């Protein structure tokens, strides 16, 4: 219980005004996960969202709702992650996700396709990883017309706080089509396994 209270205090400290001045959109999330399913609640400077998802299956599925106080958007997704090469505590992976989006901020529904390549390490209590993804999205209402959206570079450190609780600290660097930095976002998340 003490670890949970300390973690909650750390999350509040990391998302105070000093952090929000340095980055455009600081996110705090909490997730509860079983071996095959999870639910996540998150909030940032502009919106709140809830996501339900599966894990560890041949294909993973998800559904989400995001609300910014004025508009409400919905999404359903399917994805797959493949471990490519694992040597000791170091590994690499490829993943892909297709997401269908609709709601108040979309004139017509659109599809997002996100291929990702990443590297990870498992050091016991600490498990850092880094990944690069490149989102492709359809023109609203025309799923056959695909535009490049944005690449992202993400660095994450996952710290085990106990046997069933972990804290994730994430830095996401959004890039433009020339791979130059356009925005940085910090996220802090607490995950509880049951």
Model-derived regions, located:
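Extracytoplasmic beta-rich ectodomain segments of secreted or membrane-anchored proteins
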Residues: 90-95
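Phosphate/oxyanion-binding active-site loops and adjacent basic polyanion-contact surfaces
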Residues: 71-74
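Low-complexity, intrinsically disordered short peptide segments enriched in small/polar/basic residues
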Residues: 1-2, 9, 25, 36, ...
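Short glycine/proline- and aromatic-enriched beta-strand/turn motifs that initiate or cap beta-hairpins
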Residues: 16-69
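Gram-negative bacterial Sec-dependent N-terminal signal peptides
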Residues: 1-21
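Outer-membrane beta-barrel transmembrane domain signature
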Residues: 21, 45, 69, 82-88, ...
């Amino acid at each position: 219980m003490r670890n949970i209270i300390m973690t909650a205090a750390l999350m509040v400290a990391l998302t105070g005004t000093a952090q929000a001045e340095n980055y455009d959109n600081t996110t705090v999330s909490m997730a509860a996960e079983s071996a095959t399913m999870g639910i996540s609640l998150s909030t940032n400077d502009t919106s709140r969202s809830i996501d339900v998802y599966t894990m560890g299956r041949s294909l993973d599925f998800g559904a989400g709702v995001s609300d910014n106080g004025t508009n409400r958007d919905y999404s359903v997704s399917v994805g797959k992650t493949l471990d490519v090469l694992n040597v000791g505590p170091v590994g690499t992976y490829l993943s892909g996700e297709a997401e269908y989006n609709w709601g108040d901020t979309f004139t017509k529904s659109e599809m997002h396709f996100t291929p990702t390549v990443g590297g990870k390490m498992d050091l016991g209590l600490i498990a850092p990883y880094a990944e690069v993804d490149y989102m492709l999205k359809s023109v609203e209402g025309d799923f056959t017309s695909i535009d490049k959206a944005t690449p992202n570079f993400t660095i994450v450190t996952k710290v085990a706080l106990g046997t069933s609780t972990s804290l994730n600290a994430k830095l996401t660097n959004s890039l433009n089509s020339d791979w130059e930095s356009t925005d940085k976002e910090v996220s802090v998340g607490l995950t509880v396994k049951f």
